[in-house]
Amino acid sequence: MSDAREPADFVEIDWAGRPVNLEYQWVGADTQSAPLVVFLHEGLGSVSLWRDFPQRLCAALGWRGLVYSRPAYGHSTPRAVDERWDVDFMHRQAHEVLPALLAALEIDTTRQPPWLLGHSDGASIALLYAARFPQQLAGLMVLAPHIRVEDLTLRSIEQARLTYQHTDLREKLGKHHADPDSAFWGWNTIWLHPPFRHWSIEDEISAIQCPVLAVQGHDDEYGTLEQIRGIARRVPQTRLLELADCGHSPHRDQPAALIAAIQAFTDAAA
């Protein structure tokens, strides 16, 4: 994201009794009165792996954006070598880390509720935040979300492990993460941990009250369309967008179509 309005910065939060530095970046409109959208990255993502999509979206909407790297990702505090994530790791990001970040940056979610835009694991975290804090969001855009574990997902994550071990994927991730092993193995190990096979947030998301746009590609290698259709069954105000010629990353595969859909969605929700 070298063309961003501001370089990445850092803020310290207290997470479970320990200090954690989070990498973050402001993009888009300078005015505090502009609507705010917070970007939550995928399971191997970071601030820089969004590339220019946050800037493009905020420019189209006239909004300001907050992009951040979760603990263990990007240049945020890495995962300790012996640290293993639990089955509730996405819940903890939604219920603990994201609220702490917003508070540290003095974002008043009661006075001016933000929007969330999440991708993959970040989309699941956004759904969990919206379910826990239903009065503190203006709306939600989720790209390739997970609401339960599918066999397709696990097969692709198993393949990702082989790719990481036997190709130059580690070096490629090293361009975006200070510690690529922290990012990769934290994500890969928990998803392939046998108890995680039963992970589901299908019941929890019924508490969501804000408008929701759920987006998925027809060629998503990490989930079937039942993921977003399952959201629509449980959150009736959900608008679905199923994109052809699109894999797991709609913002990379179909950015123009996605931005147009978000513009229409946010205009209708205003």
What are these regions (language model features)?
Residues 67-114:
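Active-site loop/oxyanion-hole signature of alpha/beta-hydrolase fold enzymes
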Residues 27-80:
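Conserved HGGG/HGGXW glycine-rich cap/lid loop of the alpha/beta-hydrolase fold
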Residues 17-28:
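A short loop-to-beta-strand scaffold at the N-terminal edge of the catalytic core in hydrolase folds
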Residues 112-150:
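Conserved hydrolase catalytic core segment
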Residues 187-204:
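Active-site nucleophile elbow and catalytic-triad environment of alpha/beta-hydrolase enzymes
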Residues 219-223:
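Acidic catalytic loop of the alpha/beta-hydrolase fold
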Residues 208, 214-216:
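Short beta-strand/loop motif that positions the catalytic acidic residue
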Residues 239, 244-270:
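Catalytic active-site module of serine/aspartate enzymes centered on a nucleophile-bearing elbow/loop
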